[in-house]
Amino acid sequence: ELISLLISQRAPKRALLLGPTYSEYARELNLVGGTLEYYNLKEEQDFRLDISDLTDTLKSDIDLLIICNPNNPTSSAISTADMKKLLTVCRSLGIFVMIDETYIEFAPEGTSLSAVSLVPEFDNFMVIRGVSKFFAAPGLRFGYGLTSNQAFLQTLLTHQNPWSLNSIGAYAGERMLKDTDYIQKTWSLIDSERTRMCTELSGLDTVKIYPAYANFVLVKILKEGLTSFDVFEKAIHQNLMIRDCSSFESLNGEYVRFCIMNPEDNDRLLDVFRSL
């Protein structure tokens, strides 16, 4: 809801997305009727953003820049320091930035990725977050946003659905954010299993993996004649669901994405990749 509300109220004539990324951004942008363009992250750079190249590309006729950090499906991320550089350039060009940090809680220890600390310094962006991923509670529809742009915040409040969050969702969301035991256990599991999975997969010559900062890993299929759908089907036959990424902007039929699971299911998925 917050993504839709933000985009509808910014109503950009020209928006820029860092691709490949979550398809709902494009859907909401198409509903408001503006022009949508992609700045595609480069595979040869492991889908990491080249800040200098992007800032050289930005022009003042762009109204809205949308960033998912860490990004879905690449699991790549932008550091807080680089985000500050980007926001500085965007502010000088009059570009508003939406930063979706839905997966930020999964980031490895010691990485500085969140833009929340930049909120007091810049009024040309909004950070949005939710509980659907880290807390495995998509049905609550509980999310929140942070911005220092008081005028835009008032616009959002004016146009927000008055019944967007019920009392049960509000109570559950508050309890979740205070559940430090769950937070630590979940983060530790994801962090250790992500490291293990990436280490194991990096030793296979049939796939290529990319540095991962979220709870999922992007994999490129290197074996000739094997498509992402083929790998998807192999996983399904083992009762494992992975994502065929061929529907993402700029990704062809060579990529799949999998989420970090419990160790036993991760072992079964490793067997699928080893069998390629």
Language model region names:
Residues 1-13, 143:
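Conserved beta-loop-alpha segment that forms the PLP phosphate-binding cup at the N-terminus of a helix
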Residues 9-28:
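Conserved PLP-anchoring active-site segment centered on the Schiff-base-forming lysine
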Residues 24, 124-210:
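PLP-dependent aminotransferase class I/II
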Residues 32, 92-93, 122, 238:
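Helix C-cap/helix->beta junction micro-motif
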Residues 37, 44-108:
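Active-site phosphate-binding strand-loop segment of PLP-dependent enzymes
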Residues 81, 237-240, 247-276:
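PLP-dependent enzyme catalytic core of the Aspartate aminotransferase-like
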Residues 191, 204-238:
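Conserved PLP-binding catalytic core of the aspartate aminotransferase-like
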